[in-house]
């Protein structure tokens, strides 16, 4: 289990708006954009948001999204899921990743 620092959801919302919102929505019933809607993300397996067209790499990764998996994925998405179509380079700063995860945990329920 990764040593994940406590995040600040308010700061994480700013990270989401700046780095993620161009391709993702978080609200229940939100539409897919270039990337899938993230509502219900925690506890869902990779490649499983209904109605979104995923790569085989995402569908076949077979992990369940949670703090630990998001921590590793958000640092370097293409390393964690080679073949993903997510073009985001990742968040190298631990505090930004922790804040974003705190925001996602709160906003995608």
Curated annotation (Swiss-Prot):
Segments spanning the bilayer are none
Could you describe the post-translational modifications of this protein?
A: Binds 1 heme c group covalently per subunit.
Keyword field contains Ion transport: no
Which GO MF terms are attached to this record?
Answer: electron transfer activity; heme binding; metal ion binding
GO cellular component: a single term: mitochondrial intermembrane space
> Does the keyword section mention Ribosomal protein?
no
Pfam families per the UniProt record, alphabetical? Cytochrom_C (PF00034)
- Which keywords does the record carry? Electron transport, Heme, Iron, Metal-binding, Mitochondrion, Respiratory chain, Transport
Q: Please state where this protein is localized.
A: Mitochondrion intermembrane space
Indicate which residues the UniProt annotation says bind heme c: 20, 23-24, 86
Regarding protein family, the annotation reads:
Belongs to the cytochrome c family.
According to its UniProt entry, the function of this protein is described as: Electron carrier protein. The oxidized form of the cytochrome c heme group can accept an electron from the heme group of the cytochrome c1 subunit of cytochrome reductase. Cytochrome c then transfers this electron to the cytochrome oxidase complex, the final protein carrier in the mitochondrial electron-transport chain.
Q: What is this protein called?
A: Cytochrome c
Species whose genome carries this gene: Pectinaria gouldii (Trumpet worm)
Lineage runs: Eukaryota, Metazoa, Spiralia, Lophotrochozoa, Annelida
């Amino acid at each position: 289990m990764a040593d994940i620092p406590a995040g600040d959801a308010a700061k994480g919302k700013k990270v989401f708006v700046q780095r993620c919102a161009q391709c993702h929505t978080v609200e229940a019933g939100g539409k897919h954009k270039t990337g899938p809607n993230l509502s219900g993300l925690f506890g869902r397996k990779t490649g499983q948001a209904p109605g979104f067209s995923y790569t085989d790499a995402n569908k076949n990764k077979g992990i369940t999204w949670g703090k630990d998996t998001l921590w590793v994925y958000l640092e370097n998405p293409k390393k964690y899921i080679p073949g993903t179509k997510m073009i985001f380079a990742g968040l190298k700063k631990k505090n930004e990743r922790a804040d974003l995860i705190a925001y996602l945990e709160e906003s995608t329920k």
